[in-house]
């Protein structure tokens, strides 16, 4: 829609998250952002990723869809870059059918996101007559928001339950040679 072409970076086999060492070789003059994915609640190495982004003047858009309540050095995933994305798709931690949320530290980028999901209409710092950019109609319905809000009270308990299940599974697989534990919560300050 906006002619963006994703370029994949390698993953770190120890964490299954983006390997910062593989990022710089993939940056070109067309690169606009780095999008680390915090997978299975395990945060990426955000210090290294943010340093690379700063060096090359790139935005950092975190995919925190599987990292609700996870932390990196005491800060919640989704708050470590310029923008953080969360999904409400049915297989995620807070399902509401479809939809998502974006958090951020940049009013300009958040205004562009608002404009994009509201049919490209001008919003906030994104000014112009009528429509500013190509956009979509990605607005959550009221009933989806009601379903979502009812789940927030359960998020902490369900996240703790997921970590307990992961610990139990890891302990059971410990004796199986082909299996290895990827990372522990303590390694990256991951907390439910």
Where are these regions (language model features)?
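PLP-dependent aminotransferase class I/II
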Residues: 21, 25, 33-37, 42, ...
């Amino acid at each position: 829609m906006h002619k963006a072409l994703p370029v994949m970076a390698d993953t770190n086999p120890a964490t299954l998250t983006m390997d910062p060492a593989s990022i710089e070789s993939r940056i070109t003059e067309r690169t606009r952002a780095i999008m680390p994915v915090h997978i299975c609640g395990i945060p990426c190495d955000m210090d290294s990723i943010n340093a690379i982004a700063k060096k090359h003047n790139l935005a950092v858009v975190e995919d925190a869809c599987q990292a609700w309540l996870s932390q990196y050095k005491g800060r919640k995933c989704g708050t470590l870059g310029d923008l953080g994305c969360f999904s409400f798709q049915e297989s995620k931690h807070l399902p509401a059918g479809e939809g998502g949320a974006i958090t951020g530290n940049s009013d300009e980028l958040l205004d562009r996101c608002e404009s994009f999901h509201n049919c490209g209409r001008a919003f906030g710092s994104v000014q112009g007559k009528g429509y500013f950019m190509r956009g979509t109609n990605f607005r959550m319905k009221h009933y989806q928001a009601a379903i979502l809000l009812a789940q927030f009270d359960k998020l902490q308990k369900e996240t703790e339950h997921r970590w307990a299940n992961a610990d139990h599974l890891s302990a059971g697989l410990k004796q199986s040679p082909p299996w290895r534990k990827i990372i522990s919560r303590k390694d990256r300050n991951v907390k439910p």
